[in-house]
Amino acid sequence: MSEKFPPLEDQNIDFTPNDKKDDDTDFLKREAEILGDEFKTEQDDILETEASPAKDDDEIRDFEEQFPDINSANGAVSSDQNGSATVSSGNDNGEADDDFSTFEGANQSTESVKEDRSEVVDQWKQRRAVEIHEKDLKDEELKKELQDEAIKHIDDFYDSYNKKKEQQLEDAAKEAEAFLKKRDEFFGQDNTTWDRALQLINQDDADIIGGRDRSKLKEILLRLKGNAKAPGA
């Protein structure tokens, strides 16, 4: 045990008084050198980290160089009386102003493009509405023409039908009148019934009709012709 923890008197240690923080730091370092890693804890790492502020300062300085403060690089942001934010440029060369001018120009260009698109869309809608209105008028005219043409065809059909019907009625009346006249003339002849019967048959081919021999009937009618005293005359 005495070998691991030799008396402090045997060590060449300078106990020159310094501020409390340096004494604590030197004491911890000496203890760490003597004991090594055998009794090292997480608290020792924390104390060592706190005892080396110079390293942390270097890291903070490197971070600030890589990522400078926005307010110090591009200007401070302040609020006016109306509560709107204003940006004051911290660059003497006006580079930040140029960046904001470029941004505002791009924004205005975008708004101009939107206005142009809106105007183009409105013009297209107006043209489309005019085209639809003209198409509706043409369709209405075509519809009216078709209706007039259909009415004309229907009228022509009924006119033609009525004319044909009247003509057929006239022809039928004439045929009936001619038939009645012929009938009256036929029965008004000064002859016998057998004479009129003989007029109704074809004397040239009256011998065979429908495969039957009619020559005997023809011979009888020829004998009764002109005989007013014959039975049934």
From Swiss-Prot:
- Map out region (Disordered) in residue numbers: 1-124
Q: Where along the chain is composition biased (Basic and acidic residues)?
A: 17-43, 112-124
Q: Which GO terms describe its biological process?
A: clathrin coat assembly; clathrin-dependent endocytosis; endocytosis; intracellular protein transport; positive regulation of endocytosis; protein-containing complex assembly
Modified positions (Phosphothreonine) in chain numbering: T49
Report the membrane topology from the UniProt record: Peripheral membrane protein
Start-end of Polar residues biased regions: 69-92
Location in or out of the cell: Cytoplasmic vesicle membrane; Membrane, Coated pit
Q: Where is this region: Involved in binding clathrin heavy chain?
A: 144-204
Give the coiled coil ranges. 125-186
The Phosphoserine modification is found at: S52
Q: Which GO terms describe its molecular function?
A: calmodulin binding; clathrin heavy chain binding; structural molecule activity
Q: Which UniProt keywords apply?
A: Calcium, Calmodulin-binding, Coated pit, Coiled coil, Cytoplasmic vesicle, Membrane, Phosphoprotein
- GO terms for CC? clathrin coat of coated pit; clathrin coat of trans-Golgi network vesicle; clathrin complex; clathrin vesicle coat; plasma membrane; trans-Golgi network
* Disulfide-bond pairs as recorded: none
Q: What is its main location?
A: membrane
Domain of life of the native organism: Eukaryota
Q: Composition bias, kind Acidic residues: at what positions?
A: 56-67
Similarity remark: Belongs to the clathrin light chain family.
Assembly description: Clathrin coats are formed from molecules containing 3 heavy chains and 3 light chains. Interacts with the auxilin-like clathrin uncoating factor SWA2.
Q: What does this protein do?
A: Clathrin is the major protein of the polyhedral coat of coated pits and vesicles. In yeast, it is involved in the retention of proteins in an intracellular membrane compartment, presumably the trans-Golgi. The yeast light chain is important for cell growth. The light chain may help to properly orient the assembly/ disassembly of the clathrin coats.
**Additional comments on file?**
CLC1 binds calcium, and calmodulin in presence of calcium.
Annotated protein name in UniProt: Clathrin light chain
